[in-house]
């Protein structure tokens, strides 16, 4: 039953006489004849009813805000196009170093799983060559070039570089806002380095890498996304053509060949490009205050999940069927936890 206020909005007047309205959205009774309400009245009624539902209200508010951001996306896209033009015409020329540089990045903002893939490459390469990792050190409070050491705090080195260093103590890890300055410093101080991984550097075109790797998530592939701030893309979709390798990350464990082919057809890779599909394999959880107590994934008790990452859906989907109760405390990406927290 439509609220009275909505019914009144659908009523019009003919020569001073009020029409009578039905309580539904479908038709309006006018002088005994049934007529469809005007499009504007339908829209008003739909919006009113939708906003009465909390879930629909949130969805509509989100869509409304996004459409308000559309002009900003066009303006942002204009800036991206100028930046691209400067490099395509070689008005700005990228620098190529003598040692191999591998760039790992993405087209969208956060949540694609770059850091685990960087760690995977470090784990593999360190057995064959002297490998180094250079990151901007997102959200750190320090500036300039810094060698990352395990005793540093996250606000000094950035949480992700610190995580990489803690897992691979023998690997050279550094942070610097300028990738050119950072690589130059690393090579000058440690000439034994044979390859450097640039974390999140696809948009930093001042360096010409030996290999450009980009990630896109299975749930939110770049080909169905839009430019910031309307969408999550940092560049136009066709920027993927600069990459040598594309990785579809966070895939389901059982990925059929039919789904693979569907994604490949939509990505439409160039002849020289390689496309891979990856998924995460989580380790067994252990007790926070007693690490010797471990659980197998199918034996989890009630869980309090505390996260400060860009995308939580993949982790939630993994944990929900493996625990009797999941309470999730969500913080923004790279959140600094206080002593109280």
Regions from the language model: what does each represent?
Residues 3-23, 29-38:
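Low-acidity, Ser/Thr- and Arg-rich intrinsically disordered low-complexity segments
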Residues 41-42:
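Short, small-residue-biased leader/transition segments that mark boundaries at the very start
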Residues 53-100:
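A transmembrane-helix-recognition feature enriched in membrane-embedded lipid enzymes
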Residues 55-58, 221-341:
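C-terminal accessory "lid"/substrate-recognition subdomains
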Residues 75, 115, 164, 199, ...:
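Residue-level signal for inorganic ion chemistry
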Residues 85-150, 253:
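Walker A (P-loop) phosphate-binding motif
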Residues 130-134, 214, 302-306:
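Conserved beta-strand elements of the Class I
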Residues 138-269:
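Phosphate/Mg2+-binding loops and adjacent switch elements
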């Amino acid at each position: 039953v439509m609220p009275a206020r909505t019914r009144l909005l659908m009523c019009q007047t003919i020569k001073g006489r009020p029409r009578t309205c039905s309580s539904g959205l479908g038709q309006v009774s006018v002088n005994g004849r049934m007529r469809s309400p005007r499009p504007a009245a339908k829209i008003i009624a739909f919006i009113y009813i939708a906003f009465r539902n909390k879930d629909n209200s949130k969805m509509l508010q989100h869509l409304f805000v996004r459409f308000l951001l559309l002009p900003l996306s066009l303006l942002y896209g204009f800036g991206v196009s100028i930046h691209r033009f400067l490099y395509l015409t070689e008005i700005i020329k990228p620098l190529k170093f003598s040692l191999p540089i591998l760039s790992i990045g993405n087209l969208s903002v956060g949540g694609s799983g770059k850091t685990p893939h960087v760690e995977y490459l470090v784990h593999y390469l360190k057995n064959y060559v002297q490998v180094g990792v250079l990151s901007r050190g997102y959200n750190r409070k320090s500036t300039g070039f810094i060698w990352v050491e395990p005793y540093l705090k996250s606000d000094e080195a950035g949480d992700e570089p610190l995580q990489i260093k803690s897992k691979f103590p023998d690997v050279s890890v550094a942070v610097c806002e300028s990738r050119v300055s950072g690589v130059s410093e690393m090579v000058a101080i440690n000439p034994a380095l044979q390859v450097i991984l640039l974390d999140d550097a696809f948009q930093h075109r001042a360096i010409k890498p030996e290999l450009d790797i980009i990630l896109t998530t299975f749930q939110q592939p770049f080909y169905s996304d839009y430019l910031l701030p309307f969408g999550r893309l940092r560049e136009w979709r066709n920027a993927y053509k600069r990459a040598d390798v594309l990785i579809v990350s966070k895939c389901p464990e059982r990925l059929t060949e039919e789904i693979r082919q569907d994604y490949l057809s939509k990505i439409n890779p160039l002849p020289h490009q390689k496309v891979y599909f990856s998924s995460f394999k989580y380790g067994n959880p252990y007790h926070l205050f007693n690490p010797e107590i471990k659980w197998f994934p199918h034996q989890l008790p009630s869980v309090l999940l505390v996260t400060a990452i860009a995308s939580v859906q993949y982790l939630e989907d993994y944990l929900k069927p493996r625990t009797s109760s999941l309470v999730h405390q969500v913080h923004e990406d790279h959140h600094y936890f206080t002593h109280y927290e």
